[in-house]
Structures are given as structure tokens and as C-alpha cells.
């Protein structure tokens, strides 16, 4: 295997007292928590795009990162080199999974024929590398937003030929995900939205993307893909308004097209921030609607109106997120994919390790704290007591449809009901959470 990160062999767990920057302080893959190992709980993945494709460019500057494989005049050979380096990184970091878009791993080429040939060639290589290293594919997806053909959307494009091109990419990416043993397939509508309503037919575009998703479901069953289909919500960027705004919006879309039993959600922390929600809110909403699937782990900046895709570094935030996940029973096919990028000034190749090690330790510590909260049941006892009235005869009759507005109005008058307010105890609960986090 190509050696690019030759300063280190493999990242290992050394414990909280370690000062080694190339060691985990909290992530012990084999530590058992609530009956599962830490590795089984977190199901960690590294993303191909930010980690191995982004060169550090932004809207105001050229690439700042040294990526030798991007300078290869033979782009296919460069993609092969990138695969070598990617799997060296994955193997040394010790994560079990990775994720990719189709054009992350292979050059798109100048025609659909070249696209298919290049993609299949690199998939052959990835298949071999998975066998060599034991690293698995958490999910695959298709990039139907970067190429200029998608400037007006992919499935929502006014031109059905563009719709067909997007279908071609998803067809190939789904088949590759199936072949590589991927456990999920993700659909993010990067340009499925609008810039202005002056040239947009909302109803038509909604019907187009609804049909596209139905076709994806049909293909899943046709090829026998056993993984989970996931939609990734995002409110805006690159379009002004995107149709998959947040978890609740996606659920409404799925219900409209009869897909709520077929597709779940892949929730990104930064996208929750852009939608004006907390990360915990989006996770809790998905769990309540039974569409929780997977997570893109990162963080945004509430002071900025765009996707900063920074690595997660808040144990406070992620403890509450982990608590929601554990309450729901944990991941099934999903996991924590680090959809995050180092900063433009982090030009040392080993900054990739520092970023991932720190983020993994944040999730590991958050898992331990959330597990303690769940085991102590303090929060759940208070929530149960708060809603205890709904277990009464009155509460059950309301929920079971045995009452009406009229009968309830009569009941209130007959019994002269005068319910007294009860404290929500928010400050007390926040103190309990902090006590667990900082103990």
C-alpha cells in the first residue's frame, strides 16, 4: 500500500492521561457500553470528498492544500493514487467505514461513456482495498449538483434530459454501493430548489422529484439492495430555498408520495444550524417520526449563513444528540460520518489526523456521558411524571378517540375542572445534564 502518512503507524487508544496527539483519549473501540462496544455504537466513517478531494479553495481564493494526487496529468491514475492514500488514512485511523460520491472517487470524463468506464474502474479498486483492509462502505451517493448541467436542478430540472442524466448517475452509484456492500444509499438534493419563483413551477418540480424518489425505491427493490435509503435535509445553499428544508419537511414530502416506509433521513449538524434548529431537535424529530437513519457529524457557525463543515468539538451538544439516539435504540444501518473539512490554513497533511482524532474523542466522551444519563433515568423519570396524566382514564379516552369537543366541554363544566400549572423545571434539568457531562 502507498505510504503517504509515513510518520505514524496506527492510531490507538491510550487513555485520558495521554499527551500523544496521535492517540485516542476517550475512544476505546472495544469498550462495552450498554451492551455494545463503542465501535458498534458510533459506526464511524470518513468522507471521501472533504478529506481527499477538497484542495482548500473557497470563493475568494485558490486551493491552499498540497494534494499530490490532484496534480497527476493522468486524472484516472490520480484517482488510483487517491484511493491508495484514502485507504492508508482509513486503515491508520482505525475507523470501520467510509463514504463517497461517484465523482469523488473517479473522474467524470468528457462523456457518459467515460464516466461509466472510469467509475467502474475505480470501484474495482475500492472493492479490492476493502478486502485488504477490512474497511467497509457506510454509504454511497451520486453528485448531481456540481456539473453545470445541474445548475437548474437534477430531478427538478425543467429539462427531462438532465433528469435522465441524474438517473444515470444514481443508477450507477446505487449499483456500486450494492456491489461494495454499502449499508445505506444517500440522496442529497444539492440543487433541488429555486433561486426565484419568477421562473419556477413549484408543483411540477415537486412532482418530478417525487417521481425520481419513487424510481430510486423501485430500483432498490429490483437489485435487491438491503440497505437503507436516506434523504439528507438542508434548507439552503447552494440554492436560495431547497425542497428538503429540514426533517419535518422531508417527512411531509415522503408522506405525499407514499415513501415514508421506504426512506429515512441522514441528518447533518451544520444543516440543522442553517435551518434554525438545534442538532438535537432534528435527531429527536426524526426519531419521533420513525425516519432516523444516519448522521453527518460536523458543526456549523451560528454567526455565519453558510456551511462551514467544521469538525465536531462540543461534548455538551453531542451528549444530548447521543442521548436521543440511545433512547431510540441506536443506529441500525447508519453511523457517524465525518462530513467535515480541515481549515484552509491547516496545510500539514497530519492535520487530517488531528481533526479526526479530536472529533472521534468528542463523540466517544459524549457517548459515555449520554449512556450515564440513560442509565440513571433521571431525565426520563421527570418526563414520565410530567405526562402521567395521559395514562389516566381521561387521557386514554382522548387518545383512543372516545371523546369529542362536545363531551370534553361538558366534562370540564360538570366537574368544574381547574388544572393547576406545574413547573417545567428547565433549570434543574440543565443542572442535571451539566452534572453528568462535567463529572
Curated annotation (Swiss-Prot):
GO terms for biological process: D-xylose metabolic process. The keyword Oxidoreductase does not apply. It catalyses: alpha-D-xylose = alpha-D-xylulofuranose. Its cofactor is Mg(2+). Keywords: Carbohydrate metabolism, Cytoplasm, Isomerase, Magnesium, Metal-binding, Xylose metabolism. Mg(2+) 1 binds at residues 232, 268, 296, 339. It is an enzyme of class 5 (isomerase). The active site is at residues 101, 104. The keyword Lipid biosynthesis does not apply. Binds 2 magnesium ions per subunit. InterPro entries: Xyl_isomerase-like_sf, Xylose_isom_bac, Xylose_isomerase. It is found in: Cytoplasm. GO terms for cellular component: cytoplasm. Mg(2+) 2 binds at residues 268, 271, 307, 309. Belongs to the xylose isomerase family. Homotetramer. NCBIfam families: PRK05474.1, xylose_isom_A. This is Xylose isomerase. The gene is xylA.
Amino acid at each position: 500500500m502507498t505510504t503517504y502518512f509515513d510518520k505514524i503507524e496506527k492510531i490507538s487508544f491510550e487513555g485520558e492521561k495521554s499527551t500523544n496527539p496521535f492517540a485516542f483519549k476517550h475512544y476505546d473501540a472495544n469498550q462495552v457500553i450498554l451492551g455494545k462496544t463503542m465501535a458498534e455504537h458510533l459506526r464511524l466513517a470518513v468522507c471521501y470528498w472533504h478529506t481527499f478531494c477538497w484542495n482548500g479553495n473557497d470563493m475568494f481564493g485558490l486551493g491552499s492544500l498540497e494534494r499530490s494526487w490532484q496534480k497527476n496529468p493522468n486524472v484516472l491514475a490520480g484517482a488510483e493514487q487517491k484511493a491508495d492514500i484514502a485507504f492508508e488514512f482509513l486503515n491508520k485511523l482505525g475507523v470501520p467505514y467510509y463514504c463517497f460520491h461517484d465523482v469523488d472517487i473517479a473522474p467524470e470524463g468528457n462523456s457518459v461513456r467515460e464516466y461509466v468506464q472510469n467509475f467502474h474502474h475505480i470501484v474495482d479498486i475500492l472493492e479490492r482495498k476493502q478486502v485488504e483492509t477490512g474497511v467497509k462502505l457506510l454509504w454511497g451517493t451520486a453528485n448531481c449538483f456540481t456539473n453545470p448541467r445541474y445548475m437548474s436542478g437534477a430531478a427538478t430540472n425543467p429539462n427531462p434530459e438532465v433528469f435522465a442524466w441524474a438517473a444515470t448517475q444514481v443508477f450507477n452509484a446505487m449499483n456500486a454501493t450494492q456491489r461494495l456492500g454499502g449499508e445505506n444509499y444517500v440522496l442529497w438534493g444539492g440543487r433541488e430548489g429555486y433561486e426565484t419563483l419568477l421562473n419556477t413551477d413549484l408543483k411540477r418540480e415537486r412532482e418530478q422529484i417525487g417521481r425520481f424518489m419513487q424510481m430510486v425505491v423501485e430500483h432498490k427493490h429490483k437489485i435487491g439492495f438491503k440497505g437503507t435509503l436516506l434523504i439528507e435535509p438542508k434548507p439552503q445553499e447552494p440554492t436560495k430555498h431547497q425542497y428538503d428544508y429540514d426533517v419535518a419537511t422531508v417527512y411531509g414530502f415522503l408522506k405525499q408520495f407514499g415513501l415514508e416506509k421506504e426512506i429515512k433521513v441522514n441528518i447533518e449538524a451544520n444543516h440543522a444550524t442553517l435551518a434554525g434548529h438545534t442538532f438535537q431537535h432534528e435527531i429527536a424529530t426524526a426519531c419521533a417520526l420513525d425516519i432516523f437513519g444516519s448522521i453527518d457529524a460536523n458543526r456549523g457557525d451560528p454567526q455565519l449563513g453558510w456551511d462551514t463543515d467544521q469538525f465536531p468539538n462540543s461534548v455538551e451538544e453531542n451528549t444530548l444528540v447521543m442521548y436521543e439516539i440511545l433512547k431510540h435504540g441506536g443506529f441500525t444501518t447508519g453511523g457517524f460520518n465525518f462530513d467535515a473539512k480541515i481549515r484552509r490554513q491547516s496545510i500539514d497533511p497530519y492535520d487530517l489526523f488531528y481533526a479526526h482524532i479530536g472529533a472521534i474523542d468528542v463523540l466517544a466522551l459524549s457517548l459515555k456521558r449520554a449512556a450515564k444519563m440513560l442509565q440513571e433515568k433521571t431525565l426520563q423519570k421527570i418526563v414520565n411524571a410530567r405526562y402521567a396524566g395521559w395514562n389516566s382514564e381521561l387521557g386514554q379516552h382522548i387518545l383512543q378517540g372516545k371523546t369529542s369537543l362536545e363531551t370534553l366541554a361538558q366534562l370540564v363544566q360538570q366537574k368544574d375542572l381547574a388544572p393547576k400549572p406545574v413547573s417545567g423545571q428547565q433549570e434543574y434539568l440543565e443542572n442535571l445534564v451539566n452534572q453528568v457531562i462535567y463529572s
